[in-house]
Amino acid sequence: MDHSYPYIASLTRESFLFYEMRSTAKLMSEGFSDDAIVKEIVEQNLFQYPTEKSITRMAKACIKRLHALEDDSLVSAIASQPTDVAKQICLYALMKQSRLVWEFMLTVIGEKYRLRDTSFGKIDLNTFFMRLQEQNDTVASWSDSTITKLKQIIARVLVETEYLDNLKADRKSVV
């Protein structure tokens, strides 16, 4: 991850999106162009969102995230591999697109695995964001509600990718 890449809070709008990513990856693997993928998703309402605008926005977000993988075999794996495997690749795509998630996974989760520390709690998220706010003016300028939402999203991503059993878990799972 390029450290000149800015921190962005778009995660509040474009969270994990596993099922959307899987649908988009299937179309991409079938050889559809990016524009044709968006058109197909909108026309078939594959994401089951209420408005065409939201479907289009999320389809483009998924395409951007899949392109961040820079590997057609990983895109194909999201489309065709078992859910647990596909979710790990989707997490990797999210990490490649979001410096915030990249650094959280490396500095918090990665460090815990390295130290064989299975504990995890709100304090880990709080410490990560406090440290980040001290180090980065952009993150420091985010509202408390944005920070809270990002913490919730990261925790949900950890549950969805089975790093945590549930949102109240105080121990990491073995992945």
What is the predicted function of each stretch?
Residues 51-52, 130-150:
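Short, positively charged loop/turn segments that connect secondary-structure elements
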Residues 59, 63, 151-156:
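Short, hydrophobic-biased segments on the C-terminal half of alpha helices
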